[in-house]
Amino acid sequence: MKELKPNVVKTYSKSSDLANMFQSGEIEAAVVADFAVDIIQGAAENVTYVVPESGTYANYNTVNIPKKAQNKETAFKFVNARISEESQKAKAISLNEGPTNQQVTLSEKEAKNKTYGAIAERAKTVDFNFINSQLADWIDQWNRTMNQ
């Protein structure tokens, strides 16, 4: 991190901050999840989203049913509606979310800037058990290195 620090202009907490930094010319490159690309390109249309050949990391939205849910049948209907082909396609188009339902087919234009197709096939998953076990140390190291 010490070697990277001189090249880090600042960090951001929401994609609109990043969009503003691109728009103002404050930055020229950033690490960003695909769902934020449309927001950034809305502010700075010359920005290009690139996924390295080595792949990207899949970032999942989840829908969960609590173990003690009182109306599990309705909850399962909600989950099924949420992952339906129709719902997933609509969210892919309107929210720039890569579909999890493999029955969803997107045109080349609709698939642009999404973890979909060949990009999704080479996406890696995050080991949250490992991350959570290291997180406190990483945050401490980040704060000592980057925030000094």
PLM segments and residue spans:
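Periplasmic-binding protein-like
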Residues: M1-L4, A44-K67
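Ligand-binding pocket segment of bilobal, Venus flytrap-like solute-binding proteins
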Residues: M1-T48
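Extracytoplasmic/secreted proteins, especially bacterial periplasmic and envelope-associated proteins
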Residues: E3, S13, D17, M21, ...
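Sec/Tat-exported extracytoplasmic proteins
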Residues: L4-V8, Y12, E26, Q41, ...
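Extracytoplasmic/periplasmic, Sec-exported soluble proteins
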Residues: K10-K14, Y57, P66-N71, F130, ...
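Solvent-exposed loop/turn segments at secondary-structure junctions
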Residues: F35-D38, S54-Y57, Q70
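Mature extracytoplasmic/periplasmic domains
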Residues: Y57, P66-A123
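Extracellular/periplasmic bilobal clamshell ligand-binding domains
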Residues: E108-Q148
